[in-house]
Curated annotation (Swiss-Prot):
It comes from Felis catus (Cat). Its cofactor is Mg(2+). This is Serine/threonine-protein kinase pim-1. Belongs to the protein kinase superfamily. CAMK Ser/Thr protein kinase family. PIM subfamily. Gene3D superfamilies: Phosphorylase Kinase, domain 1 (3.30.200.20), Transferase(Phosphotransferase) domain 1 (1.10.510.10). It holds the Pfam family Pkinase. The keyword Transferase applies. The modification Phosphoserine is found at S8, S98, S261. The lineage of its organism: Eukaryota, Metazoa, Chordata, Craniata, Vertebrata. Its EC number is 2.7.11.1. The keyword Cell division does not apply.
């Protein structure tokens, strides 16, 4: 069954990375002001990154998310091909925003004297995976498998585009409740992917690998696999496996729900204490538990449409 669906999912894997030059304005064309293009709605959320509001694009009533980031809160900067200095988040989003549907798209951005404003796509109706699990509890393995496959494809797409997300967690995954499609969001902790070691980390500590807790060093790909293991455990058990540094370093996984032996094996493999013992993305997708993956629309029809949608964001 899985092999018959690979072609249906192939567009996710082969989507091209965005050419940063492609979004430049034509010579002599000035960008219209933010206020004339977008109508700002209620606050969706706020934190150390700034604030995110719902909004509407005036030209076509397209739902958008409007993210305000204060300049004095930006710790990592990047540069566009034309030399413009922007938050690294803008650089990363431009690299991954393409025809691939599993990563949130950056539609536009604006610079203000004291902040940057990012215009992002906003599916409707939508709920993040954290709220979805909080309301419904541990997911059935069939649903968890579909969700996990989509997240894995999103992370693979990012890596193929040279981007390391560094904050893979349930709060940063949106579920389109109509289509059954997941989208990876919030690249504010991300970095350009490299083969050498990282010595900085701004993501969520309980999703971070033991090598970061112990040595403040990690490699991007193996750290991402650890976070994916935490996420899969969260899906099938309803909560994360570790809360404290000592638990992360010890790495002992106890299952609070009935979980199949194949799923347990995959989780424990992703959560191997030695980074070199963790699977590659390809090995995860070839794992026995990852076979017979539902397509997003099948997921919506079987698991989502029969449920009452949670509150939209």
């Amino acid at each position: 069954m899985l092999l018959s669906k690979i072609n249906s999912l192939a567009h996710l894997r082969t989507a091209p990375c965005n050419d940063l030059h492609a979004t430049k304005l034509a010579p002599g064309k000035e960008k219209e002001p933010l206020e004339s293009q977008y109508q700002v709605g209620p606050l969706l959320g706020s934190g150390g990154f700034g604030s995110v509001y719902s909004g509407i694009r005036v030209a076509d009533n397209l739902p958008v998310a409007i993210k305000h980031v204060e300049k004095d809160r930006i710790s990592d900067w990047g540069e566009l091909p034309n030399g413009t200095r922007v938050p690294m988040e803008v650089v990363l989003l431009k690299k991954v925003s393409s025809g691939f549907s599993g990563v949130i798209r950056l539609l536009d951005w604006f610079e203000r004297p004291d902040s940057f404003v990012l215009i992002l796509e906003r599916p409707e109706p939508v709920q993040d995976l954290f709220d979805f699990i909080t309301e419904r509890g541990a997911l059935q393995e069939e649903l968890a498998r579909s969700f996990f496959w989509q997240v894995l494809e999103a992370v693979r797409h990012c890596h193929n585009c040279g981007v390391l997300h560094r904050d893979i967690k349930d709060e940063n995954i949106l579920i389109d409740l109509n289509r059954g499609e997941l989208k990876l969001i919030d690249f504010g902790s991300g970095a350009l992917l490299k083969d050498t070691v990282y010595t900085d980390f701004d993501g969520t500590r309980v999703y971070s690998p033991p090598e970061w807790i112990r040595y403040h060093r990690y490699h991007g790909r193996s750290a991402a696999v650890w976070s994916l293991g935490i996420l899969l455990y969260d899906m099938v058990c309803g909560d994360i496996p570790f809360e404290h540094d000592e638990e992360i370093i010890r790495g002992q996984v106890f299952f609070r729900q009935r979980v199949s032996s194949e799923c347990q094996h995959l989780i424990r493999w992703c959560l191997a204490l030695r980074p070199s013992d963790r699977p590659s993305f390809e090995e995860i997708q070839n794992h026995p538990w990852m076979q017979d993956v539902l397509l997003p629309q099948e997921t919506a029809e079987i698991h989502l449409h029969s449920l009452s949608p949670g509150p939209s964001k």
